[in-house]
Amino acid sequence: MSTTYTKREKFRYLLGLSGQNIIYGTVTSVLAYYLQFTILIPAVWVGLILSVARIFDAVKDPFIGAMISRGKHKLKDYLIAVPIPTAILTFLCFSNGIYSAENSMPKNILIVLSAFVFYIIWEVVFTIGDIPITGYPSVLTSDEGDRTKLLSLRPIGGMASGISTLAVQPIAFALSAVFGGSAVDERNAFLITVAAFSIIGGALFQFTAIGSVERVSAKRSENSGQLRYFITNPLLRKISISGFLGSLKAMTGVILTPLVTYYFASKNPQMSMIYTALFGVGSIVGLVISAAAVPSLSKKYGTKRLFAAVNLINIFPNLLLFALYVKYPQNMTDIPQTVAMFVLTLIIGSCVSISSTVQTLIISQAVDLEEKISENRPDALFFSAQTFIVKIGTGLSSLAASIGYAAVKFSSSETAALNDFIANGGIPRLDGRYSNLMTLLFMLYTLPVAMSSLLSAIPFIRGERD
């Protein structure tokens, strides 16, 4: 048996990774918008649903990682079992009714509870597949160079996530317009769109481990103290602290959809597609750069120095983007501002994408280090740190966003009024009644990310070589 993966295994892994990311992008890009702005659950409840579910899910990730690392099953067993349930639960997350003052209190309570229950179950099931797929390259080959190459191709999955992020909302808006444009029509349009993306994503996700061979056997520990690695392994400890300090970088994904919808597009499907693409192209370019350049850059400068550098660079374009809005609060759609915004988001997206890829490489190095230290190789546990970082960030960002909405008094009734205003031809960014909301959206999109980029670089600021 060869010591590294075949071309077919590589292709199937990337295909499955793309499918998993389509599902992930579908949920993370529009669920918060759907709950608050389509089915009109009050912002405070949406913030609690998303933050509590995400924080709970993040906290339990290391325990699921430890369970997988200690278990008798191979990673591929999880990757074969999880895709179809994940796709079904994705659809169920968008199956709620519409929250309304005209509903009875029990009905509204049921709508809120069902949103919470379906989402938290989705999080648990998704994690059971996410941890194995993140760590799968580490068991497909014992060659560190080949492993780095495959891990560096993970941005291909991110591109698939980017495509779903770009497409889901504009498609749903277009379908809603065809159906009639009411709140019920928009709800049904999202349900149909999400169903289509769930089927495509689940089908591709299923390919991940079919026919693959795990060439590196995890040295499984039978003791129950594996969580000590988060303290005793210096690399895992640093990247976990860095991730927690940088939690609010996830605000970009939380705020992007309402920012595009209400400031730039006024719920126009074509403009939603254009401006989501404008904001998203930076991430896609960054993913391409990650796949092409991270192996050589990390070899030349070291992963720790590279990680610190891209996070520090990311501070400045975020600050400049907010300053641009402060200068032109109603005119960000003018050509000069649009060009400047495109350049800034290109830099931001590139920094975020490179940072995420390098983070994965550092965790892989932490696994190798642990094997040298203790002769244990808990791949799943260590890669659960990355899912923990993502989820705790999204949870805290969702909570912060809901507090912000409450601060500007933007609740369920105000959302319905804003939707009616747009339906009657209004443009929110040009109306003084919504200036506080527009400022809040830009502020949340940029300032927490700048602060978190600085904080996440601190554990690696000394930049020692690998």
Predicted regions and their residues:
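Membrane-embedded alpha-helical bundles of multi-pass transporters/translocases
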Residues: 2-466
